[in-house]
Regions:
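Acidic, Mg2+-coordinating phosphoryl-transfer loop and its flanking beta/alpha structural elements
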Residues: 1-17
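Short acidic-hydrophobic, aromatic-tinged amphipathic segments that line or gate anion-handling sites
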Residues: 19-23
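Generic structural signal for hydrophobic
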Residues: 12-14, 163, 186
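Conserved beta-strand-loop-alpha-helix junction that forms the acyl-donor binding cleft
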Residues: 7, 173-183, 200-203
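GNAT-family acyltransferases
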Residues: 24-145, 157-172, 192-222
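Conserved active-site alpha-helix within GNAT-family acetyltransferase domains
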Residues: 117-118, 153, 178-194
Length: 222
């Protein structure tokens, strides 16, 4: 599954390896498990909190995710028209391969440990904004039945820590100006509103930025 590149070993044939490593400093059980899951197209665990498990989505999750998206108020939504279930299923292998296995990002399932139920989705995705600007954007959506219980903050707080571990410097989120609960969550996490507008967005969409090195905010609000 993994191959070790040894510069002193002469010619190596590592063509069958799913992952090539050059050292062992950052190799642990979690890393090996993720490589195994990606090589076998299985959902890998992203992070955990006392109440939640955040993991990559599987095709079996898509009907529930589509139902979750339908709860999102159209007038406060940021993204465009939602795809049908058939379209989501057709596109999922490409999404999994690009987002999860190549970019090591994506939207992930948020699962309540006690019940084992999916209660939302959250994650980070690479985006291209104005004039080809590359950013990493945080998105989150919690099932209406589980809102106002701190789940959104708990999941996103863990994801911010994970994003920093994966090398992110800044994270951004786009929020409709009337979505007061989402704005409050972003501010609680440490996001600050910036004077920036994404060209394809409606004028009501605001942009917030988070500095991943802001450990003090994470510690104080954890």
């Amino acid at each position: 599954c993994m191959g070790y590149f040894n510069p002193d070993s002469g010619k190596q044939d590592l063509s069958q390896a799913a992952m090539i490593i050059e050292g062992y400093e950052e190799i642990d059980a979690r890393f090996v498990e993720k490589v195994y899951c990606h090589n076998h197209h299985l959902p890998a665990v992203v992070c955990e909190t006392p109440r939640l498990l955040v993991r990559e989505m599987s095709e079996a999750d898509l009907p529930q995710m589509l139902a979750l998206n339908e709860q999102n108020s159209t007038e406060n939504a940021v993204e465009g028209k939602e795809k049908t279930l058939e379209e989501e299923i057709e596109n999922f292998p490409s999404y999994r391969r690009y987002m999860y296995e190549l970019c090591d990002m994506g939207y992930w399932a948020v699962i309540e440990k006690q019940s084992g139920k999916i209660i939302g989705r959250a994650g980070i995705e690479p985006k291209i904004w104005n004039q080809g600007r590359s950013v990493v954007e945080l998105g989150y959506l919690i099932d209406a039945a589980y809102q106002r219980q701190g789940y959104g903050y708990e999941a996103c707080h863990a994801i911010l820590l994970e994003a920093k571990e994966r090398g992110a410097k800044y994270l951004y989120c786009r929020i409709h100006s009337e979505n007061k609960s989402s704005i409050a969550l972003a501010k609680k996490l440490g996001f600050l509103k910036i004077d920036y507008h994404v060209e394809q967005d409606a004028k009501e969409i605001e942009v917030y930025r988070y500095v991943c090195g802001n450990d003090r905010v994470l510690q104080e609000r954890g």
